[in-house]
């Protein structure tokens, strides 16, 4: 069983199901989905931090709860932003091999500079080291460092401490090839997984963006309907 955690934001609910559909259709192993839904996490007493004016999604910080939500048990698990889609024929289970058991986490180590000053949702865009690294993560939940990712720490740590991985060390962050977090207009080569980080094609401004047809095809399958 491969556990997959997807960040949930009500403004991107269509993207959540589109991503899930693209994962299931090519899966070589059973998939267990958990959606990081902030109201549910808040009601459960797991998330209580105030909204950061710089955060653009509801799951900006809750993504780091993944090891805790797995009870820090052995077995590699995946977190994904919801604004992603797998290319046809891509098996998400291949990702876990990029996170050796002697590492805490594996990510695509982007060198990404945003092209605009506003993020999704209207939040201000801030360039910083390791930007987008946390948008796709393979965790080893039972390592010593991942066990430090408690609800208390995640609710009190700064965005820099979390998203720049100051809770671990550089030597314990494994690298995933960029084809697994491929950004339209930025990444080179052929993608396995496309990340519409500026906005999914469900948003009017990005309806016809690069590789939009891949997203729309998955959306139609997920909804079992035609969209004009």
Residue ranges and their predicted role:
Residues 57, 95-99, 126-129, 164-168, ...:
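A general structural signal for short secondary-structure junctions and capping/turn motifs
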Residues 46-54, 119-124, 190-192:
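Short, surface-exposed amphipathic charged segments that create phosphate/polyanion-binding patches used
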Residues 9-13, 79-81, 127:
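Generic detection of long, well-ordered alpha-helical segments
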Residues 62-114, 138:
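GT-A fold catalytic core of metal-dependent nucleotide-sugar glycosyltransferases
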Residues 1-5, 11, 17, 28-29, ...:
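A glycosyltransferase accessory/donor-loop signature
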Residues 97-161:
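Conserved catalytic core of nucleotide-sugar-dependent glycosyltransferases
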Residues 20, 24-26:
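Zn2+-dependent metallopeptidase catalytic core
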Residues 31-70:
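Active-site-proximal specificity loops/subdomain of glycosyltransferases
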